[in-house]
């Protein structure tokens, strides 16, 4: 979707940009596919803060998304393309021939009225879901399963796509959006094409108010805290007082490896690109 900018009649509007929503065809969601989300403010069941700087924001209804695409060999018509406040990508409403409706992630290039199918015999066209064994090498895919039948877990953000590079036995070599090349079982399902809403990465919020509207609270610097609250806190003036940057829990930051060497690291052929 194209990006809309504004004249700088205030300082926050100067750099603000929003999506034009030009491809959105329906404004209200399908009521049977929504449920209420209760905001937690980053807290767990005992009230402790598990994720800092979360809270507030606009009320949202959760749209139930079909990540499994397990209604095989039944054509579904794309009824509408809708906005989803819970994710960066748009969503598409499908209606199957038997009358059932489901939401899926909106694949780039799919239009209202198109027919989509999932199953081993589906054609290679954007929006169709197939096992990796039936997808040609070089094809771009999204909504990629990691465990057979569990539903898509990888490649679901706006504008991303993974590429199938090779197939060898029970596994396929897949290049992820991060640049990592890893093995995924060929029985896992993936959806053809790229996730829509490509211009999401170009949107600039422009004001603190829009951040609060999304449920994000101000991120406090460690040097602005007291010594009891952060390793960088305290002291005379704004000085963190130590040489190496650290997290609030005193773990070295900026380059310190925190990922454990797990048993299944053998599935990673090539590590991701590091910026």
From Swiss-Prot:
Pfam families, per the entry: Ribosomal_L2, Ribosomal_L2_C
Its biological purpose: One of the primary rRNA binding proteins. Required for association of the 30S and 50S subunits to form the 70S ribosome, for tRNA binding and peptide bond formation. It has been suggested to have peptidyltransferase activity; this is somewhat controversial. Makes several contacts with the 16S rRNA in the 70S ribosome.
PROSITE patterns in the cross-refs: RIBOSOMAL_L2 (PS00467)
InterPro entries: NA-bd_OB-fold, Rib_uL2_dom2, Ribosomal_uL2, Ribosomal_uL2_bac/org-type, Ribosomal_uL2_C, Ribosomal_uL2_CS, Ribosomal_uL2_dom3, Ribosomal_uL2_RNA-bd_dom
Any single biological process term in GO: cytoplasmic translation
NCBIfam families: rplB_bact
Quaternary structure, from the entry: Part of the 50S ribosomal subunit. Forms a bridge to the 30S subunit in the 70S ribosome.
One Gene Ontology CC term in the entry: large ribosomal subunit
Protein name: Large ribosomal subunit protein uL2
The family this protein is said to belong to: Belongs to the universal ribosomal protein uL2 family.
Record's compositionally biased regions (Polar residues): 240-250
Chain residue ranges for the region called Disordered: 222-257
PANTHER family (alphabetical): LARGE RIBOSOMAL SUBUNIT PROTEIN UL2M (PTHR13691:SF5), RIBOSOMAL PROTEIN L2 (PTHR13691)
Keyword terms of this UniProt record: Ribonucleoprotein, Ribosomal protein, RNA-binding, rRNA-binding
GO molecular function: rRNA binding; structural constituent of ribosome; transferase activity
């Amino acid at each position: 979707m194209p990006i809309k900018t504004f004249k700088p009649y205030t300082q926050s509007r100067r750099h603000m940009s929003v999506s034009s929503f030009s491809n959105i065809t329906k404004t209200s969601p399908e009521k049977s596919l929504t449920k209420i989300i209760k905001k937690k403010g980053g807290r767990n069941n005992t009230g402790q803060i598990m994720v800092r700087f979360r809270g507030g924001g606009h009320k949202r209804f959760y749209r139930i998304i079909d990540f499994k695409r397990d209604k095989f060999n039944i054509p579904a018509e794309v009824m509408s393309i809708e906005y989803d406040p819970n994710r960066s990508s748009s969503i598409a409403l499908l209606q199957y021939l038997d009358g059932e409706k489901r939401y899926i992630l909106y694949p780039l290039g799919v239009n209202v009225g198109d027919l989509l199918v999932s199953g081993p015999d589906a054609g290679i066209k954007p929006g169709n879901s197939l096992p990796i064994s039936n997808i040609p090498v070089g094809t771009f895919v999204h909504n990629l399963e990691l465990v057979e039948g569990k539903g898509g877990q990888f490649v679901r953000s706006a504008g991303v796509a993974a590429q199938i590079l090779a197939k060898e036995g029970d596994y396929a070599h897949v290049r992820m959006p991060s640049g990592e090349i890893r093995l995924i079982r060929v029985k896992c399902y993936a959806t053809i094409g790229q996730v829509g809403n490509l211009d999401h990465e170009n949107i600039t919020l422009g004001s603190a108010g829009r951040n609060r509207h999304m449920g994000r609270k101000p991120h406090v610097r460690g040097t602005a805290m007291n010594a009891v609250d952060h390793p960088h806190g305290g002291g005379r003036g704004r000085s963190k007082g130590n040489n190496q940057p650290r997290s609030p829990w005193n773990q070295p930051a900026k380059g310190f490896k925190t990922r454990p060497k797990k048993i299944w690291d053998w599935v990673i052929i090539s590590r991701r690109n590091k910026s």
